[in-house]
């Protein structure tokens, strides 16, 4: 199965936990039996929690997925947080290049994005933030600045 076919089959579902608390679970039919496949080291799902506090307090997003889920995750998040000027705190539990790519997308959309990470995580975030694949001459893309940590 091609990478584009697998990506097209991914989706993000919303599970209301309580008023203002929403679980955003990224699913793939290729990984529908999470516990068994995880035990066999064949993959996992992407599970995030959004605390939407309303207009007064910032929203808090815990453990956003990596870029592999960006095409299905970002539109669902935008439904919940339509105001791009709303403050958004993002708790980053583990850092890798795939996750940093999605965080860059969030930084482009939400101008008041703040990242929350451990000291070690913040150092890795700062190093990975500016890394990118080389672009052909004349096709360089401006990246958003690293949000406050």
Language-model regions: role of each:
Residues 1-3, 43:
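Intrinsically disordered, low-complexity segments enriched in Ser/Pro/Gly/Ala and basic residues
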Residues 3-11, 15-19, 110-149:
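Metallo-beta-lactamase
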Residues 11-79:
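Conserved beta-strand hairpin/beta-sheet module of binuclear metal-dependent hydrolase folds
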Residues 26, 100-102, 120:
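Generic hydrophobic alpha-helical membrane-span motif
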Residues 31, 95-100, 122-125:
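Active-site environment of divalent metal-dependent phosphoester hydrolases
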Residues 41-45, 79-83, 109-112, 134-138:
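Short, low-complexity, polar/charged sequence segments that are solvent-exposed and flexible
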Residues 46-51, 85-88, 114-117, 140-142:
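Glycine-rich loops and low-complexity Gly/Arg-rich segments
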Residues 65-116:
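Active-site metal-binding motif and surrounding structural segment of the metallo-beta-lactamase
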